[in-house]
Amino acid sequence: MDMTTLLNVDRVNKQYKDSEFKLQDASLTISTNETVGLIGKNGSGKSTLINILVGNRHKDNGSITFFGEEHAAGDVEYKEHIGVVFDDLRVPNKLTIKDIDKVFQSIYTTWNSQKFFDLIKYFELPLQTKIKTFSR
C-alpha cells in the first residue's frame, strides 16, 4: 500500500436483520488531503458505509485500514482524522451552540474550542439559541 493512502476500504459487507438491503463488496481508497463525496441512488448503502467508517455500525466482513493499519469499530483515534457531514446533526435539537462545544470536547481529544467559537463569531450565530432553530 502506498503511504499516501489514508483510508482503504476493501470488500466491506453489511446486511441488516429482517431487511433485504445488503451492502456488498464496498471498496474505495482515499488518499491524504483528498476530499471525497459518496454519490448513489437511495438505498444503495452510502449512509451505511459512512456509519461503518465512523463506528456507528459494525461491518459483517471486509477490511478497513487507516494508513495501512486495521482498526476496530470502537477505535476512536483514527476517526479524529476523518470529517463527515451528515444530512442531520447527530446531537439533540434542544442543545445550544455552547452545549455542542461541551459535548464535542468530551468526545474528541483534538477538539479546538477556540477555532469553533471563531467560526461561530464569523457566522454571527447566537450562542444560546437551540440548534433546532437553525437552517441546514
Regions found by a protein language model. Give the residues of each.
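ABC-family P-loop ATPase nucleotide-binding domains
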Residues: 86-136
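ABC nucleotide-binding domain signature
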Residues: 37, 80-87
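The feature captures the beta-strand-to-loop junction immediately N-terminal to the Walker
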Residues: 39-41
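A short, flexible loop at the N-terminus of ABC-type nucleotide-binding domains that lies
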Residues: 2-26, 75
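Conserved ABC transporter NBD signature motif
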Residues: 62-73, 78
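Helix-to-loop junction immediately C-terminal to a conserved catalytic motif
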Residues: 54
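Pre-Walker A (P-loop) beta-loop-beta motif of ABC nucleotide-binding domains
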Residues: 26-37
